[in-house]
UniProtKB/Swiss-Prot annotation:
Keywords: Carbohydrate metabolism, Cellulose degradation, Disulfide bond, Glycosidase, Hydrolase, Polysaccharide degradation, Signal. Coiled coil: none annotated. The keyword Transferase does not apply. Pfam families: CBM_2, Cellulase. This is Endoglucanase E1. Residues 401-411, 437-449 have a biased composition (Low complexity). It comes from Acidothermus cellulolyticus (strain ATCC 43068 / DSM 8971 / 11B).
Length: 562
């Protein structure tokens, strides 16, 4: 019994006072229960793991529910779509749809000094990106993402912009370069928890192995070397390690086979930093045999359990489905996605005690999956986005002023000899090849910016220019080009014009950083009001997107300046 309610002989006043005090205390307690206290928002600070969960700095469980926005890994050296939209509006839309994390693919090319993006429209958009290197553009994206409560996972997607590689090194990009570039980025964003971690290498596949012990092809050992190198720079980062293609003769999607991780786990020097990552796709990427199994889709949970789900189910480590996607055109793909979403565990039922995920992709220009955005880079595919609604999660707290990079990264290490897999390790072709989505561009019809009035160029004394024409991407019926205009004279230009004649039926559908007009096969590109002045020896670039059939030979370009 509470002290105030005990009977004190001859003290009825004390009893009444005690009763009043007790009643008031009870009312206050009930009032506190009646008014819900605001829940602590998840995602603050750097993250760590505990069993199969990811926790924030306050030990609040978080769920990565995100999207892939690619482009830094291509020869555009920047996220795609900035030829149509401002990067901030893109990030705002990602947040508005309920995605809280962006997997940001890149290649080691962007760490080479002076690498510049070549497909950004600066006309009434992206003006604060003008003149920035690719890395500096990445800084801007990371900073704004953090300000609005998004998080970033940096994904070493390719060694260079020419394409994916089975192993983490190639003849031109060594393991030493791979590791030093990871460390440089870790140093660059050190102190900024917007960048929560690194996906060390995208989709290792044959001849990459798991647990075979050969340092030239054992991806598990390479992941330990790279992961520990990153953690030596910033021990607070998460290390995301994908699987391989084959284990004990059992083939799966590239990067999706984690069957060996139970027996041969990745061991890092810093505990509670490891997240395993898998990729999974539907028939629009490749018609794997399990899609035609008569028990489909009931067979799929067992396949997922075997290859990567067991790591979560057995509380070994968190599992992040870093890529999964589909055009959603076939009923099989629709059934696959619905089944997979349930397997990943709906947030309303399981909260953050669930699989982590980032959908492939935000971009519409992924040829075998399409994207959440449609080809105009504005309209949302609400059907596809709707399939993901049950597994979306909350947006995180904004990151403060720490969004600036801590330092410039050191230049990439010059390639040094890397271990080469022996001929005996070359895999035997399997009856069912495993495809990986290679982004291909789809023409995007957006208005061409209007140029400010400029006089027709005349050959003024000392005003000269040259132009170079470079095809960035060609997917068989369309392509993108960057044209570099260089001042080859002795005085600054006031205006410039580049012209050429196509040899086929190429038709320009979109352009940026120049006023481009086409009359039949003849094309003229004139400067905008903001890039007319080029100092001697300096250059500016513009670009365009076009469609074609037949051949697509590069034309000869001419440049005139005044």
């Amino acid at each position: 019994m509470p002290r105030a309610l005990r009977r004190v002989p001859g003290s009825r006043v004390m009893l009444r006072v005690g009763v009043v005090v007790a009643v008031l205390a009870l009312v206050a307690a009930l009032a506190n229960l009646a008014v819900p206290r605001p829940a602590r928002a998840a995602g603050g600070g750097y993250w760590h793991t505990s069993g199969r969960e990811i926790l924030d700095a306050n030990n609040v469980p978080v769920r990565i529910a995100g999207i892939n926005w690619f482009g830094f890994e291509t020869c555009n050296y920047v996220v795609h779509g900035l030829w149509s939209r401002d990067y901030r509006s893109m990030l705002d839309q990602i947040k508005s749809l309920g995605y809280n994390t962006i997997r940001l693919p890149y290649s080691d090319d962007i760490l080479k000094p002076g690498t510049m993006p070549n497909s950004i429209n600066f006309y009434q958009m992206n003006q604060d990106l003008q003149g920035l290197t690719s890395l500096q553009v990445m800084d801007k994206i990371v900073a704004y993402a953090g300000q609005i409560g998004l998080r970033i996972i940096l994904d070493r997607h390719r060694p260079d912009c020419s394409g994916q590689s089975a192993l983490w090194y190639t003849s031109s990009v060594s393991e030493a370069t791979w590791i030093s570039d990871l460390q440089a980025l870790a140093q660059r964003y050190k102190g900024n928890p917007t960048v929560v971690g690194f996906d060390l290498h995208n989709e290792p596949h044959d001849p990459a192995c798991w647990g075979c012990g050969d340092p030239s092809i054992d991806w598990r050992l390479a992941a330990e070397r790279a992961g520990n190198a990153v953690l030596s720079v910033n021990p607070n980062l998460l290390i995301f390690v994908e699987g391989v293609q084959s284990y004990n003769g059992d083939s799966y999607w590239w990067g999706g086979n984690l069957q060996g991780a139970g027996q041969y786990p990745v061991v890092l020097n810093v505990p509670n930093r490891l997240v395993y990552s898998a990729h999974d796709y539907a028939t629009s990427v490749y018609p794997q045999t399990w899609f035609s199994d008569p028990t489909f889709p009931n067979n799929m949970p067992g396949i997922w359990n075997k290859n990567w789900g067991y790591l979560f189910n057995q509380n070994i480590a968190p599992v992040w489905l870093g890529e999964f996607g589909t055009t959603l055109q076939s009923t099989t793909d629709q059934t696959w996605l619905k089944t997979l979403v349930q397997y990943l565990r709906p947030t309303a039922q399981y909260g953050a005690d669930s699989f982590q995920w980032t959908f492939w992709s935000w971009n519409p220009d992924s040829g075998d999956t399409g994207g959440i955005l449609k080809d105009d880079w504005q309209t949302v595919d609400t059907v596809k986005d709707g399939y993901l609604a049950p597994i979306k999660s909350s947006i995180f707290d904004p990151v403060g002023a720490s969004a600036s990079p801590s330092s410039q990264p050191s230049p990439s290490v010059s390639p040094s000899p890397s271990p080469s897999p022996s001929a005996s390790r070359t895999p035997t072709p399997t009856p069912t090849p495993t495809a990986s989505p290679t982004p291909t561009l789809t023409p995007t019809a957006t208005p061409t910016p209007t140029a400010s009035p400029t006089p027709s160029p005349t050959a003024a004394s000392g005003a000269r220019c040259t132009a170079s024409y470079q095809v960035n991407s060609d997917w068989g019926n369309g392509f993108t080009v960057t044209v570099a205009v260089t001042n080859s004279g002795s005085v600054a230009t006031k205006t410039w014009t580049v012209s050429w004649t196509f040899g086929g039926n190429q038709t320009i559908t979109n352009s940026w950083n120049a006023a481009v007009t086409q009359n039949g096969q003849s094309v003229t590109a004139r400067n905008m009001s903001y890039n007319n002045v080029i100092q001697p020896g300096q250059n500016t670039t513009f670009g365009f997107q076009a469609s074609y059939t037949g051949s697509n030979a590069a034309p000869t370009v001419a440049c005139a300046a005044s």
